[in-house]
Amino acid sequence: MKFVEIRDLQVTYMGKTKPSIVIDKLDIEEGESVLITGRSGSGKSTLVSVINGVIPHLINAEVKGEVRVFGLDIKTTPTSEISRYVGTLLQDPDTQAFNYTVIDEVAFGVENYMVSREEMINRVEESMKICGISHLRDREINTLSGGELQRTVLASVLAMRPKALILDEPTSNIDPQGTREILELVKTFRSEGISLVLVEHKIERVLPFIDRIIVVESGKIAVDIKKDEIIDRADLLHSLGLEIPDYMLFLKKSGFRRIDYEYLRKTYNYKPPSRNEGKGEILFASVKVKTKSGKYLINTKISLKQGTITALMGKNGSGKTTLLKAIVGLIDKKRLIVEEEKVIVNGKDLSKAKLVERGKYLAYLPQFFDVMFIKRTVEDEVKFSMKNRGVYDEMRLGEILRIFSLDAYRTEDPLVLSMGQRRRVAMASVIAGGAKVILMDEPTSGQDWYHRQILGKELLELRNKGYTILVVTHDARFVDRFTDYLLVMSDGKIVLEGKPEEVFSKSLNHGIEPPLEYELGGLIKNEQFS
């Protein structure tokens, strides 16, 4: 039996006249592992929403053609039945968690199946162990980091024992160590015959764990190849906006049809880009935040140079998001104790300043940014940010929308856009506010390589105009290409700092993997790909 059978599919969202996806034929065999990739907004999420029955049952859209999942017609089969066969990990785990504690969340789906208590306990314990969250069992959901939350949601899906899994950007909010663990789980699922659909922008990460690559472009399947054909098709995939590492293009030009790491280590040279030194300190913060039980979540100092882009990396739960929230004044003081929160921006002491006052100097883009949207159109969202800070200008509004490729979406509701598009709306709104120091929590998450490059280039432009930017990210290649300095956090403290190439030479001990180009080019030693 096939996992997925699609014939003559057209999906048109309510209020739209043009189909979002048009697919003549697509088959996925039971037990097959398939990567679905493509630019942000290309139709990937729509396709998987059809496969798991979310469309048309939960999202109102017209579905023409035939779609069968393990022989079930998705048009007539309720999602409650489809979910017994197909489990889904959504791109934003925050939208998938409903319970108070981790163990309650993992048990929730199984409880709805009314299995025996003994069976439920076994499934929950096994799923938490697989996902490495057993130690979080009694933690409140709202205290988890993004990666911890993602593993919790995945455990809740696994506990339902589906025949197939759809993982929508499963590594987007997880640190490199967590990514390896999740992909090892994928390897385990494959060995057990579970059918897999991975939606992922970063092909390099998942290549060892898949059989096939499907590229969606403008709502259609543009490429459908076996994974061994990736070098042969490297130029085409690159032209479609996919992240094809430089060493793969090098192999293509050298006449290779397969990845040969031994050849690369002998012949491939890599030189990191030049960095900006900066013009002196613009931000200094000394922060101490602890739980009511006395455990320090943050106990560190941070300094940023004016006119630089600094990356902040570290394992999930190391304190990166908490540090940013402390700097901008967003710590929940009913839940946590702020022992010290000294913040100086451009010589002005903001330590006792309220949120609105800090907002004149500091702009903040949160990790889960949908909570920022309060207007019904993209244009009004960005305009509101400008007016709220007293910097509204019509020409500047148009410029910002063009910078972030949002001009065509002026009248769209931000919440109906793809995740990557919504993130660009949030970034445009943050930058439009006028502050000269910008703190971004995972702005690369969920973005395709094309838009990550655009983001990086625009951050460079902002840097060259005098802005100072701090970016929390797990994307080492983005850090290498677009940032000037790199900070690494561990257990609430900054433990490494310097230029990316300096820090990458020491970062493996802290769970930070440099881009593979560093190892292949002889800049560092890493046995992972030997």
Curated annotation (Swiss-Prot):
Q: Which domain of life is it from?
A: Archaea
User: What keywords were assigned to this record?
Assistant: ATP-binding, Cell membrane, Membrane, Nucleotide-binding, Repeat, Translocase, Transport
Q: How does it sit in the membrane?
A: Peripheral membrane protein
Q: Which GO terms describe its cellular component?
A: plasma membrane
Which residue numbers delimit the ABC transporter domain? 6-243, 282-516
One GO MF term attached to the UniProt entry: ATP binding
Q: Chief subcellular site? A: membrane
**Where does the chain bind ATP 2?**
G314, K315, N316, G317, S318, G319, K320, T321
Q: Kindly list the positions annotated as binding ATP 1.
A: G38, R39, S40, G41, S42, G43, K44, S45
Gene3D superfamilies, alphabetized: P-loop containing nucleotide triphosphate hydrolases
Q: Which GO terms of type biological process are on file?
A: transmembrane transport
**Function in brief:** Probably part of an ABC transporter complex. Responsible for energy coupling to the transport system.
Family in the record: Belongs to the ABC transporter superfamily.
| The name this protein goes by in its record | Putative ABC transporter ATP-binding protein SSO1893
